[in-house]
Amino acid sequence: MSRVCQVTGKKPMVGNNRSHAKNSTRRRFLPNLQNHRFWLEEEKRFVQLRVSTKGIRIIDKKGIEVIVKELRARGEKV
């Protein structure tokens, strides 16, 4: 399973670790992804999404029905 938020599209990004001596080594910054079940009232079932914590806040704001409609319009299976 890829580390991509289904709502926001957040992906891992790359950067550097910096030691006290300013040595740099490459590292990855991973998004804070959660597997979360949401209840779809109109379909009377749960849908499981892999979303970032910001994605969960967006779902709280807009509503799960709106987000699922947007995901299906993009062609994602929900």
From Swiss-Prot:
It holds the Pfam family Ribosomal_L28. Gene3D superfamilies: Ribosomal protein L28/L24 (2.30.170.40). It comes from the Bacteria. Belongs to the bacterial ribosomal protein bL28 family. One of its GO terms (molecular function) is structural constituent of ribosome. GO terms for cellular component: cytosolic large ribosomal subunit. GO terms for biological process: translation. Residues 1-23 are annotated as: Disordered. InterPro entries: Ribosomal_bL28 (IPR026569), Ribosomal_bL28/bL31-like_sf (IPR034704), Ribosomal_bL28_bact-type (IPR001383), Ribosomal_bL28_sf (IPR037147). It comes from Shewanella frigidimarina (strain NCIMB 400). This is Large ribosomal subunit protein bL28. Keywords: Ribonucleoprotein, Ribosomal protein.
